[in-house]
Regions:
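Short loop/beta submotifs within extracellular cysteine-rich repeat domains
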Residues: 90, 105-106, 115-121, 198, ...
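Extracellular/lumenal glycan-associated surfaces
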Residues: 103-116, 215-228
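Conserved small/polar residues in nucleotide/adenosyl-binding loops
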Residues: 289-294
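Conserved hydrophobic core element of enzyme catalytic domains
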Residues: 2-79, 89, 115, 127-173, ...
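Acidic, serine/threonine- and glycine-rich low-complexity intrinsically disordered segments
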Residues: 195, 206-213, 217-224, 234
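Long, charged all-alpha helical bundle/coiled-coil segments in cytosolic proteins
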Residues: 96, 122, 131-135
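Short, recurring structural edge motifs at helix starts
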Residues: 91-99, 203-211
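Alpha-helical scaffold segments
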Residues: 107, 133-134, 204-208, 219
Length: 294
């Protein structure tokens, strides 16, 4: 029944998204890019694609930072067009996608400020999808309560800060604890929202968000080895969802070394090849190919 009425509210934007997909670079385009000897060659190769205009006004010599900046602006422009034309529940879904960027921007600013980084440089590094009006004021916050009261109370992140007030001082360890508490609350909230929509959204996003929750649980476990973070506090940072939850989470909360983590994670069939390269460094960038393989 849902399919019969989908086009009433979603048909136009689905067509827009399909257009975005069709404009993406093809394997042939990427093969041509591998033959480029410099960035001007890259600009010339892109000129024959749908990306032909996004570097047209960039002066020579072309810089890699300019390419990254223009590509980000293109992504943001296309995303904002979708959000501006969406109706509920799609509009709310797209809002949720920006919350992770907000969290990253908040942590970037308070960490950079703690270490005396230039405010303007920090603001320039913030992702546009995570921008909100009071973001610059984060640079003067000295504790969690002030951070919430003066900056975040009017943002969507305010609901996720309820469990953060035990960390009153903004030092490196507490900032990392705040980051993980925010992500825990965000992922659980996003998952509940997707389940409330039901249908393909609940099914597809359930898989993706469960994987993201497990990835964060694994990262928190490994990164806490050799730190002042207690096992009890570590367990509180784990999202209450995912294929590892609850048994795997409980076991990871007690783990002391990587081999134990590996054994626990490999108990989940989808994750048996996760540690194949035996690389701790690779865990932080685990890709969703592990989902597609199953």
């Amino acid at each position: 029944m849902e399919g019969l009425t989908f086009n009433i509210n979603g048909g136009y934007l689905e067509g827009v998204v399909r257009g975005y997909k069709n404009s993406m670079l093809t394997p042939t385009n990427y093969q041509a890019l591998t033959q480029c000897e410099n960035l001007e060659d890259l600009r010339m190769q892109l000129s024959a694609t749908d990306y032909g205009n996004f570097l047209a006004n960039e002066p020579s010599p072309l810089a890699t930072s300019a390419i990254a900046h223009r590509a980000t602006l293109k992504l943001v422009s296309e995303f904002e067009y979708l959000r501006d034309n969406a109706t509920a529940p799609l509009s709310k879904f797209l809002d949720y996608l920006t919350y992770s960027y907000m969290i990253d921007n908040v942590i970037l600013l308070i960490t950079g400020t703690l270490h005396g980084r230039d405010t303007h440089e920090l603001l320039d590094r913030c992702h546009p999808l995570g921008w909100f009006d009071t973001l610059p004021a984060l640079c003067v916050a000295t504790n969690v309560e002030e951070l919430y009261r003066t900056v975040l109370v009017e943002t969507p992140l305010s609901l996720y800060f309820r469990d953060c007030f035990s960390s009153s001082d903004l030092d490196d360890l507490n900032i990392e604890i705040i980051r993980n508490k925010l992500y825990k609350a965000y992922l659980e909230d996003f998952a509940n929202f997707c389940q409330s929509i039901g249908g393909p959204t609940a099914e597809s996003m359930g898989e993706l968000l469960a994987f993201e929750a497990d990835r964060r649980t694994i990262n928190i476990t490994i990164n806490s080895f050799g730190t002042l973070l207690s096992k009890t506090e570590r367990a509180r940072l784990f999202p209450s969802m995912g294929k590892l939850f609850p048994g795997g989470n409980n076991a990871l909360a007690k783990a002391d070394e990587l081999d134990q983590v590996k054994g626990i994670v490999e108990s989940v069939p989808e994750y048996r090849r996760l540690f194949d390269d035996n690389s701790i460094a690779g865990i932080g960038s685990v890709s969703y190919t592990h989902l597609r393989a199953h």
